[in-house]
Amino acid sequence: MDYITRQTFVKLALFIFTVLRSSCALLEKAAEDPVHPNPLQSSPAEDSDVSFCDFESPCSWTLSSHSTGGDWFITSAQQHRSSRRDTQPIRDYSTGKSEGHFLLLKPSSSHLSAGRCSFHMTSPVVLSSGPFCHLQLARFQPEPHAGNISAFVKHTDSTDIKPIDLTIKEQESDSSQWEVLEAVIGQLNEPFQVTVQYSACSSHEVGFLAFDSLELKNCVMGDDYVDLGSDCEKYSSLQCHSGGCIEKQRVCDFHTDCPEGEDEGLICSTLPLGSYCSFELGSCGWLAADTQSSWRLVSGQQLIEDTHLLGTTLKNTQGHFLFLKVRGHGDEREALVQSPALPSTISNQDCQLQFSLYRYGDFNGTVLLSVVESGASAPALIWERSGHWKDAWQEITLPITEILNGFHLKVQAFWTSGSKADIALDDISLSAACFDTELNELLHEGLPHDLDFSPLPEPSASEASPITWWFTSCGASGPFGPTQAQCDSAYRNTNVSVVVGKEGPLRGVQMWKVPATNTYKISAYGAAGGKGAKNHNKRSHGVFISATFPLEKGDILYILIGHQGEDACPGRNPQTHKICLGESSVIEDGFDSDGSALKWAGGGGGGGGATYIYRMENGQPLPLLIAAGGGGKAYLEDPESSQDQSFREQYENDTTVSGVSGRSGAAGGGGGWSDVSSLSWAGKSLVEGGQGGSSCPEALSVLGWATFGGFGGGGGACSAGGGGGGYRGGDAPLLDDISADGQDGLSFVHPMGKIFLQPLAAMESHGEAEIVVYLNCSHCKTQSCKRDEDTKLILCLCDSDEVLAPDNVTCAGTKHSLCQFINKHLQHNSSPLVCPPLVVPMGSLADGPPSLVFIMAVIVSTVVTGVVLTCASLTLIYYRKKNHLHAVRIRLQSPEYKLSKIRSSTIMTDYNPNYGYFGKAASLSELKEVPRKNITLLRALGHGAFGEVYEGQVLGMNGENTAMQVAIKTLPEICSEQDEMDFLMEALIMSKFSHQNIVRCIGVSLQILPRFILLELMTGGDMKSFLRLNRPRTNHSSSLSMLELLHMARDIALGCRYLEENHFIHRDIAARNCLLTCPGPDRVAKIGDFGMARDIYRASYYRKGGRAMLPVKWMPPEAFLEGIFTCKTDTWSFGVLLWEIFSLGYMPYPCKTNQEVLEFVTGGGRMDPPKSCPGPVYRIMTQCWQHCPEHRPNFTTILERINYCTQDPDVINTPLPVECGPPVEEEGGTVIRPDGSGSMTPLLVARSLSQDASPRASITSVTPQALKPRLQLQRPVHLTQEVGTYRETLEPCWAEPVPASGVCPGPWLQVPEHRPCSRSSSSSGSQKLKNKTKNLWNPTYGSWVLESFGRGKSALCHTQSMPLSCNPTSVSAPSSTSEHTDPVVEVNANVSASPPPSAAPSQTTLTPTAAPSRKSPTGAAGVSLATVMDLAKLQSFPCGNVNYAYDEQSYETESLPVVVSKSLEPSTSSAATSSLVALSQPGSFTHKPLVKRHASYGHEDVRRYTQPEKPTRDRDSGFSLSEDLSVTPV
């Protein structure tokens, strides 16, 4: 039953969908094919077809008929046979076939005898015609006759008849003898008809007469193609729009020959670059061929103040030109300028070269012009001139007699010593016929852009949509307005047609003719101001204002579109370019405390130009609407001004208020309406032409910094910004203050207009203007209306709850009200409509308020539904995320998988652009991208801060096709946005460095995932590991010497000096961050990790509350107390680095926690010298540790003192200390990752020094030397066998607590206050948990990530310190902290161990939460248990900022595993839930998990799962989370 019901609903839905689709299709078809209400209206193409008759189809021409049979017959050559073949055509004219039809005149004899001698053909009515309208027809009349053929034009609304002359245009040469007759009609603005008449009064006079192909050509306005007139040859002349022809040689010769100027318009803009150049828009590609040439682009206005000119013509020359000043006293004897590469010419008949040359003075030399063809051995000389000329321009025209194949023009001037002359070059043109023969086709492409003020159709209510005219700057910018050619190109294919003024105050002003009398809404947009060199966050916006004006047909509106003020950057020369890049601060340094200029000036932005719309009355301009321009920004942003500070825009509407220009100071004020200013840097008023001001003289003379104001009165800039143009110009600061912006101009609305939109500063670029036919909605109730697209009528708009009445004016509330309105206006004899009842919607107040039960039911159902959906969504998200992470961990766990996973992908990157290095902005485009195909990964080196680090090869980096060994840092594909930003920032930082003691960034590969950073391969590893590995020991001598240690210190000092000189603060100079090129004696130490610098520069502040790690033991007091980081911070860190080097890799401040180090350093304490440290070296350390940063030496001084040490025999001959601690294998073992992990959970080993601990939970060892901290593991099931590893070695004696004095009297190191290394009695179990950590380290290029988990929390610490004793048999307390302390992780055990001060050193008690008792397998002198230990596994996550947990793959095992069978005894305590790891006697198997220990910290912001409780003490790792310190953001 349900199935049948569903089928029914489906069929019903399909039926409804089909009906709706059919209805929509009918509506769309009706919309696409509208019904024309006037059948007489047709398109121009249809009119052209109607006026053409070839008699192959029905013809619209009317034929005379004086008899019932008719006088004209349509026939063909096959149908009409004659006895004489030469008296009839063998084919028609239109088709050229014998089957084609033509019109034959064959009057009857009775008609001729009646005296009717006239026969005619009349065209259909033509509404109007263009200037090239003409009649064309074909006639066949083989024998001369007395009959006469004529044509005339008759206007339909009058009796006037205008005869037109028929002339023979062409005649077929074959026997068909068809003649083509043509008569010019011309432009007619009234409807007319054309009549062709033949007069003959006898059959003999008629003879055989046939017509074909009657056509009115080019008579319909708007034809895309216009045939040439009869007096123009298509391929040898150009037809002007208004009639007449000019020769092709005169096209594009800088002389306007056509009345409308089309011969110098769009055609010339299509010519190749450099072939038509007046130098008004730039050099057009004409450049000096050598850098020593003196040719330069100038204008006549720029030469007015030049007193060294020899003549006056150049000063009076308008526009720009190339200028060469010849002065024979110098070494220069020639100058050369050449054009850009030009294409091949296609004709040599009408091709000619024309240019204007000026040469005046005592010139002992020659000026020559040559053509250099591509591939030619020598240039072809086409013109040469020497001698003396007058002080005037000479126009030179040269014919190009040969077809050139790819060439350029070259103008050379040679002179001898003693010459003194001025030479100028202007208006260079190769005629358009050189490159294109179809000039008329090029011209007709621009016909929609007629330059005359041809009236547009008057807007009416029947138009489909309001007409809009949009005016722009025509692509021009700067202080001068556009040209006619620019506006013609910009308004192409639009309805805008303007004439641009060329001279005087109207230069650059666009003139537009109002097409119809109506009310227009005019909107004006002022231009924005320019940006300052270092004040480019936000520009001053131009003002938008709109008003309505009544305009009459034929009115001329003058529109000046404002140009944006020029930005100060990029600079015009290398010095200003450096200032823009932030590499130079000469302007800030050259200003007084009050902000006034001392020497340097420039760098401000120019003022924006205003947009003026006005018209002429009695020869004087009358402003209608003025949108003010924005002021220019100063060189620097005012720190006291708010970024969001805004001012209320104002406007003036009183014409009696004078439109003065803004006040000018060091920068130029904005131009007003009718003011006059003599300052060149002030913006000109509109009556002066509205040109933008130039830069202040100081900026031009010192820095050559030219920053102009925009066209429209924008003021020129200095260090302060220029004022904006307007009705009243914006003021500029009186003093050249580097942070004083120019003010905006004042807008204006004429009282005759009505404000439509209040002014608003919103324009961010050049100005604009919009003119729209305004819809008058005053008759509507809501004062708002629109134009209906179907009826073309204006319809009033009603509110959402109202309906428009049939009168299209009134709004009725409901259908009931509408019905009442209709009945009210019905006639008396009409029956009223039955109105529907007034329906009140449910739930309204008519039904009363809803009940409380209903409200509660709705609320409860909503809440329940929301909770259910929320829970379901969260559950789904949780399981999906869990499964996804599990899959990702499995896939990305192996480094070999990443080796094979190279997949193409597009990089999407974002970074903070506000921070740069070495004064330069950081950009990803500066990184050297290496194609992925050139990179080969060889093997994995380790895991770094982001991902795996590989050794690889890259091709093509050294200029040869040889492979370069590199280290490759990778960023996993699946990572957070912060990791990606950190990765890119580290690449940007390292790419900026170029020094022999800083690891070099070879390149990057960011376009394909995973992303790579290619670094210099450092095979020697990090310095800390190298020093620890090469310590001299009792049975092992070291190859290191004191001189080699000094060389390593010198190498790092060289790198630090490079960073210091470039004002770069490293923030973490330490041995762990220094790498060695090789382990041999030729090693070079380099700085290789910029983790902290990356974190600082990646964000705009130092995150105090984040999880960033701070190297406390390497930081000076002002850094961790006040958050101040300077170059002196690195000096302090370098002192600690020296201590590390000469202690051979020990942790600074031994046995001190971070908090103790803070108190120790701030209290004035400093570390003692390492053992065997030479005195001069220790003095360098203490000088680096001066409390006052100013007293610390810079790295140049440090380098000098290190060099002195290298030359001191007492220093370099000092022997290195011999260590009697553990063998080297315990410090540098490799990590062995077993295949299986088991299911063990690591637990904390709670150790107590108390002798009165519970004997059931303790095991006493009789051999204190063998006591080791062990890892207690909890197993959910009993295991019978385990794989264990052991290494019987002695712990170092320097990390153990000593209960009695004198036990730890280090012979070469005295710790301040003689504090033992034991934990205080206040240390809690949670603190011990925090002190146990896991170190993850990339041996060569990685960063450190330290993390441990315990009871839902993690901690970051380190376990390295200095040895306190050299006695290998010293008693070791298991609760002590050594340099090789085993990691211990607490999972769910509650441990509370507080050893008393009197704990015996010879006995250790391990107290777990619960542990079953075990018997020693040996049962000998002590308890020796085979511990149950499994290897922890290191979880590898796909991102750099990850948490690392312990599992079976994180410990180092012995090469020979020992399988020990264990039997687990049941626990006698109900609380015993975990197994115990015991300690063994000497000779028994001792399982000691070994972990690589190196001092570092995690550069990434390591996130812990939960927030741990605040510990009382920290491990002596040297690092602390930033949230534990009071760090001021920097």
Swiss-Prot record:
PROSITE patterns: LDLRA_1 (PS01209), LDLRA_2 (PS50068), MAM_2 (PS50060), PROTEIN_KINASE_ATP (PS00107), PROTEIN_KINASE_DOM (PS50011), PROTEIN_KINASE_TYR (PS00109), RECEPTOR_TYR_KIN_II (PS00239). GO terms for biological process: cell surface receptor protein tyrosine kinase signaling pathway; developmental pigmentation; iridophore differentiation; maintenance of cell number; melanocyte differentiation; melanocyte migration; pigment cell development; pigmentation. Residues 1497-1517 have a biased composition (Basic and acidic residues). It catalyses: L-tyrosyl-[protein] + ATP = O-phospho-L-tyrosyl-[protein] + ADP + H(+). Residues 873-1530 are cytoplasmic. GO terms for molecular function: ATP binding; transmembrane receptor protein tyrosine kinase activity. This is Tyrosine-protein kinase receptor. Glycans are attached at residues 148, 364, 495, 653, 776, 808. The keyword Mitochondrion does not apply. The keyword Cell membrane applies. It is found in: Cell membrane. InterPro entries: ALK/LTK-like_GRD, ConA-like_dom_sf, Kinase-like_dom_sf, LDL_receptor-like_sf, LDLR_class-A_CS, LDrepeatLR_classA_rpt, MAM_dom, Prot_kinase_dom. One of its GO terms (cellular component) is receptor complex.
